[in-house]
């Protein structure tokens, strides 16, 4: 969740400095991450939390070819119970993330978690008007598993199986309008993610798989677009299109902004060479867009 208020291999420098009993600092991908604990966790939990945040930062840095902001403050609310929730990213001059962690959270729960990576992806995109909120959440929903997979933290079977299951939740229902005018949970998160997938595939088709969505997103960052600034969506998309050399995002936005669009997902999965039986994804590398699938997921 994001609020406006308050596959290339790159060398990533990781340093961990314990600043005080209730704080730590990471330096990853050119960014500094200051971690503050609202209450001091036991040392084993502290280490798991710091490692979990570092893993997410490395994943995001791999996808964006560097950490998306120079500095971010991460406030970890350590409380009773198990699990990770209540993640939020905030922008303006001093980007920060708030997230809650239960004292009894296990190593497996940290390993499986998507929340902190999702929030870090929010750092890499400008704040846009409220009616465009779907692009912020959709982008984080789409990029998070891909970034984790490219960093070696998720399997290809996992990311594509989850996409097959999830993307259908983003299809318009009866009475829905375009993405700018239908703000249900499914259309905001998965409808936005579907927009990103369609854009990623189309960019790769038009550029012979030389460019992908990440190249456009990196172009936004290089032009100064991050959570620290507020841009109109059309400016943001045009900036990304200039980076890829093809006007895919602007054209797709014009198509989907006001009008409900229902792409043939079954055909898309077939073209990408993805077969999903409800439990496990398998792949057909002879499919026409198999190379696109591999380039997106990094596998």
Where are the regions a protein language model picked out?
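Bacterial N-terminal signal peptides
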Residues: 7-15
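N-terminal export leaders
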Residues: 2-6
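Soluble non-cytosolic domains of exported or imported proteins
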Residues: 43-55, 106-111, 115, 130, ...
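Beta/coil-rich, acidic/histidine-enriched accessory regions frequently appended to metallopeptidases
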Residues: 32, 226-299
């Amino acid at each position: 969740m994001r609020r406006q208020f308050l596959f290339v291999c790159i060398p990533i420098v990781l340093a961990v400095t314990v600043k005080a009993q209730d704080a730590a600092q990471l330096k990853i991908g050119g960014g500094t991450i200051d971690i503050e604990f609202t209450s001091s966790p036991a040392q084993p939990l502290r280490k798991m939390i710091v490692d979990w945040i570092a893993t997410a930062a490395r994943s995001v840095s791999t996808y964006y070819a560097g950490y998306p902001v120079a500095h971010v403050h991460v406030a970890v609310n350590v409380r009773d119970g198990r699990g990770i929730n209540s993640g939020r990213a905030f922008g303006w001059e001093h980007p920060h993330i708030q997230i809650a962690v239960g004292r009894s959270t296990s190593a497996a729960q940290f390993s499986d978690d998507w929340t902190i990576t999702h929030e870090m992806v929010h750092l890499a995109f400008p704040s846009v008007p409220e009616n465009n909120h779907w692009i912020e959440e959709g982008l984080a929903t789409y990029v998070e598993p891909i970034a984790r997979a490219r960093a070696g933290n998720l399997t290809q079977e996992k990311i594509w199986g989850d996409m097959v299951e999830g993307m259908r939740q983003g299809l318009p229902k009866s009475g829905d309008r375009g993405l700018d005018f239908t703000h249900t949970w499914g259309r905001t998160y998965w409808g936005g993610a579907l927009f990103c997938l369609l854009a990623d595939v189309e960019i790769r088709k038009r550029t012979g798989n030389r460019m992908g969505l990440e190249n456009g997103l990196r172009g936004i960052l290089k032009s100064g677009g991050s959570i620290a600034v507020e841009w109109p969506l059309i400016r943001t998309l045009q900036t990304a299109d200039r980076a890829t050399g093809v006007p895919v995002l602007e054209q797709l936005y014009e198509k989907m902004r006001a009008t409900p669009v229902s792409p043939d997902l079954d055909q898309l999965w077939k073209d990408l060479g993805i077969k999903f039986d409800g439990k496990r994804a398998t792949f057909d590398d002879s499919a026409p867009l198999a190379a696109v699938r591999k380039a997106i997921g990094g596998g």
